């Protein structure tokens, strides 16, 4: 049965196959963006809500500092990145910037409260969108990254025999 890469990674973590050095990500204070297509139209794992819990569990396995955005802005109540639905074109950048406003406001809150400097996502559209719009909101474009980028930074190769 096909599975999302997060499901495979989570399974390997649960079985102790992957080992991490969380300190490899100590330069990052991380939050997570629930991509709207994944949040509303996907399922991960064996139980409802896996699409929310699995990416966060992977992040927590790889970083020492993780902070969710406000509860009313995540999971089933997540905000669209503003770039989906065919909007991911430079011709529509003004609309994309406006569409990202609710997420940018939620992000700004955790930046101010917790010093967040990295927003992880699992959707390629979201990552492309945020790379473009983050500078409009006075954040560096490299503030957005992938969950598996964190995995890659922290993985300890050759730890298991």
Label each region the model flagged.
Residues 1-161:
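Iron-sulfur cluster-binding electron-transfer modules in prokaryotic oxidoreductases
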């Amino acid at each position: 049965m096909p599975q999302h890469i997060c499901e495979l990674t989570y399974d390997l973590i649960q079985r102790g196959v992957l080992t991490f050095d969380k300190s490899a990500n100590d330069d990052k204070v991380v939050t997570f963006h629930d991509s709207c297509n994944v949040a509303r139209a996907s399922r991960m794992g064996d139980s409802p809500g896996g699409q929310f819990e699995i990416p966060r569990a992977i992040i927590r396995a790889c970083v020492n500092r993780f902070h969710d955005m406000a509860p009313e802005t995540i999971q089933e109540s997540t905000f669209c990145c503003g770039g989906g639905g065919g909007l991911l074109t430079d011709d529509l950048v003004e609309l994309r910037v406006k569409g990202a406003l609710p997420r940018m406001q939620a992000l700004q809150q955790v930046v101010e409260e917790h010093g967040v400097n990295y927003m992880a996502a699992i959707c390629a559209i979201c990552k492309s969108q945020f790379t473009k719009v983050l500078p409009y909101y006075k954040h560096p474009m490299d503030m957005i990254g992938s969950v598996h980028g964190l995995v890659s930074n922290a993985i300890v190769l050759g730890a298991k025999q």
